[in-house]
């Protein structure tokens, strides 16, 4: 129903986009046992904490610059095949350090994958460097400093992800100040595992242009109005929210209510194979589960381009492709 529509994705974690087939091949290549995390082509986890553990274990099978080029190229090729014109990938240089590859080689591999994919299909992509809450404020500050000093034109944003229940946003203000001063776009995970207060905290402390998820703002109607008045863009990932039991079903999900309240919303897939989804499915759900028509879905895609962390020339070119 939505296969003909142009698509844009603002919220996808790179390692979280790794297909089970590619991960299995990588595990065989390195002789790594991931049977506790991947069985019969399905990633195995049971709650948010175990999902993060599964994610980290799966990430261990991607070890070299070429591994990351392949992972990135494979996902962007998949996106291009469903009419996607732009993707922002959330990446963690800290992961490159932890596996002994190093942040520079990790990012270099990802950038090579972006170049390969663009050469084939014309898909544009940018990188959002993220700090992980569960590694603590100093680690997050390090990620911000890396992004700020990298001087890489493909690194255009900074994010805070990970275990949302660890610390308040105020603990990470310095990291966002570093990123802001470097001219990076700011987005932050909030209003997913934690309630509306986490969205308010993010607005108060960080003043981000965008919020990853943010859907639980619906629990505070004054906050919803504030989001609408500010023009803050929500990177909404309905399939992820259902998989993580933020909401029991799509009928309960507030995507439509947020949009009708004037909040600027977009559609993304988060960690697609972990949540049995894809960007293609998320767009189809917008039509089938939420009842949006083509024009409404195109409007959300336009919002995503308007909110993308890109230079104005690229933004104009993307808007012209809609």
From Swiss-Prot:
Coiled-coil intervals: none
Enzyme class at the top of the EC tree = hydrolase
Q: Which residues bind Zn(2+)?
A: 11, 13, 189, 270
Q: Which cofactor does it need?
A: Zn(2+)
Active site, UniProt feature: 192 (proton donor)
For this protein, what does the record note about how its cofactor is bound? Binds 1 zinc ion per subunit.
Going by the UniProt record, its keywords in alphabetical order are:
Hydrolase, Metal-binding, Nucleotide metabolism, Zinc
Q: Which SUPFAM superfamilies match?
A: Metallo-dependent hydrolases (SSF51556)
Enzyme Commission code: 3.5.4.2
Please name the HAMAP family in this protein's record: Adenine_deaminase (MF_01962)
Main function: Catalyzes the hydrolytic deamination of adenine to hypoxanthine. Plays an important role in the purine salvage pathway and in nitrogen catabolism.
Q: What is this protein called?
A: Adenine deaminase
